[in-house]
Amino acid sequence: MMVHCAGCERPILDRFLLNVLDRAWHIKCVQCCECKTNLSEKCFSREGKLYCKNDFFRRFGTKCAGCAQGISPSDLVRKARSKVFHLNCFTCMVCNKQLSTGEELYVIDENKFVCKDDYLSSSSLKEGSLNSVSSCTDRSLSPDLQDPLQDDPKETDNSTSSDKETANNENEEQNSGTKRRGPRTTIKAKQLETLKAAFAATPKPTRHIREQLAQETGLNMRVIQVWFQNRRSKERRMKQLSALGARRHAFFRSPRRMRPLGGRLDESEMLGSTPYTYYGDYQSDYYAPGGNYDFFAHGPPSQAQSPADSSFLAASGPGSTPLGALEPPLAGPHGADNPRFTDMISHPDTPSPEPGLPGALHPMPGEVFSGGPSPPFPMSGTSGYSGPLSHPNPELNEAAVW
């Protein structure tokens, strides 16, 4: 039975053969698929193909974070954070100096580095340029900075002083050996206008839009991403402040007058806007609402009177007032020298007067009636009324008016 080669699929007629991956091979067919080098001691395979050690690690091994090429197991590397670099790729992005072990450096975008000397020199140059800013605010932006940018030219002095303080703080941190921020990126006026226009169109741009902005402005994509994050944060904060101001204006616009708990009501609040007046300290003769009948303090009449043929006249002496509409008289405290009712017509043939208005009594002189003046009933010296509700003395008689 003939044995066929796994590489060329031809029958193996040679005296010697190689067994690779449990299959028979010609000696000349066991070679690297990349460099065509014959493999005699050791080989690597992937997807049925054979590779030498260098080509296998170059293609499928760990990639260098600087050049994105594979790292051979024999190569010397440097490691920063979680990234691995070739020795030639681990250089300063400003002066291209190769960084050595133990040297202080500043990491930018995870795969770029700046040596300490270049970083300190750029910080001093930036501070000098910030002192000369006069027209527009080109505030520096750090990739780790999360505060929103100040876009108003009126705030140039504030942004300049804040940048000075930041630079001083960073220098102090460098002297103390603590963790420091990366270098700050200055955004120019034209770049800022481009970013503002892009933010007005799309507040949250996609990666493709950020790449286009990076090409237009020359800024790093990380810087652009952080600028948009800060600008969105500023917009949200401005909306919150405006909403809070609107609620506060609505609350204080029309304050209500509030009465303290347990406070007493005013007489004006109790009476409201009623058309009737209220006299609290009126000391003279007054009339108040009463019933449809009156009580008179008098002696025994000369003859029996009936409500139909009796008429009463109000006195016209000093201090007395004719009765008004819907105001029957109310008894009050009167002395014997000021009688309220002095005359009463008691002639049986005298007709009773017809009222002009309903509920109104008109004073009339006693001489009008044919019977002449009747003898008056004397008023009692002390009032026959016991209270403000006009209750008669039980010794007096009662006569109804209407």
Swiss-Prot record:
Q: Does the keyword Transcription regulation belong to this entry?
A: yes
The annotated regions of Low complexity compositional bias extend over 124-148, 300-311, 322-336
Q: Where in the cell is it found?
A: Nucleus
Q: What is the protein name stated in its UniProt record?
A: LIM/homeobox protein Lhx5
Provide the function of this protein. Plays an essential role in the regulation of neuronal differentiation and migration during development of the central nervous system.
Record's keyword annotation contains Magnesium: no
SUPFAM superfamilies per record: Glucocorticoid receptor-like (DNA-binding domain), Homeodomain-like
Entry keyword set: DNA-binding, Homeobox, LIM domain, Metal-binding, Nucleus, Repeat, Transcription, Transcription regulation, Zinc
Q: Give the taxonomic lineage as stored in the record.
A: Eukaryota, Metazoa, Chordata, Craniata, Vertebrata
Q: Name one GO molecular function term.
A: sequence-specific double-stranded DNA binding
Record's PANTHER family? Answer: LIM/HOMEOBOX PROTEIN LHX, LIM_HOMEOBOX PROTEIN LHX5
GO process annotations (BP):
cell proliferation in forebrain; cell-cell signaling; cerebellar Purkinje cell differentiation; cerebellar Purkinje cell-granule cell precursor cell signaling; cerebellum development; forebrain neuron differentiation; hippocampus development; neuroblast proliferation
Q: What Pfam families does UniProt report for this protein, alphabetically? A: Homeodomain (PF00046), LIM (PF00412)
GO annotation, cellular component aspect? nucleus
Query: Signal sequence: where?
Result: none
According to the record, the residues making up region (Disordered) are 124-186, 298-402
Q: Which Gene3D superfamilies match?
A: Cysteine Rich Protein, Homeodomain-like
List all membrane-crossing ranges.
none
- The Swiss-Prot or TrEMBL record marks DNA binding at 180-239
Query: Compositional bias of type Basic and acidic residues: which residue ranges?
Result: 151-167
